């Protein structure tokens, strides 16, 4: 008797399992709101047209719409609503439960217009100086790929940082002087280019030395000139010491007579 009841119960459950197959989850897009409509579809046995079924919706294995007679769920088009969706159908008494397969839905946000800045320490850029290009897109689904351009030529390789900004460190070249530079941000659904900017004037090595040495040598040369001028002035305009004017010597009368007298005696 007990065995017969078990067999009867198993047969009833097997028949119940055949009342409907596993459901199928499909998606549609609302043309006005761009929201995604999920529909849980199931084929009911024509022999049981009055069978009452209930639907449950899941996202990443978490219930997002609890058990209800509604077979439709609407997901707003937001990036945070991306994930794996699934639905389950069960009978009114809950004895039969069947789940659909997973449906991977991804909501992508277009990348925003990137902002480009140039950072450098030198006041006057010279060949070989280091500069940093910084490009940032404030919105857009990750990953975002960044590329930098100057005069229409790409600098390095595209960058894909984990965040929303990318930077490129580069050495200044002479041909960059006053050329246009820009950056590009791109994700899986869109791409945007920043505004064009003018690269600063790049001075040559000789001009850089002259412009940088002038503030150093100019004060030194002025100081040296002042010292030389002071020495010259001191040399030519120093006060002279007054000396007593020497008296003109006069011949003594006796000596002069003696000399004449001697001569006269010699030639007599």
Curated annotation (Swiss-Prot):
Residue ranges of the TM segments: 216-236
Residues in Ig-like C2-type domain copies: 114-194
Alphabetical list of PROSITE patterns matching this protein: IG_LIKE
This protein's UniProt keywords: Cell membrane, Disulfide bond, Glycoprotein, Immunoglobulin domain, Membrane, Receptor, Signal, Transmembrane, Transmembrane helix
Topological domain spans for side Cytoplasmic: 237-268
Pfam families documented for this protein: Ig_2 (PF13895), Ig_C17orf99 (PF17736)
GO cellular component: external side of plasma membrane
UniProt-listed InterPro entries: Ig-like_dom (IPR007110), Ig-like_dom_sf (IPR036179), Ig-like_fold (IPR013783), Ig_Fc_receptor (IPR050488), IL-40-like_Ig (IPR040878)
The keyword Magnesium is assigned to this record: no
Molecular function GO labels: protein phosphatase binding
Side Extracellular, residues: 17-215
Protein name as catalogued: Fc receptor-like protein 6
Species the sequence originates in: Mus musculus (Mouse)
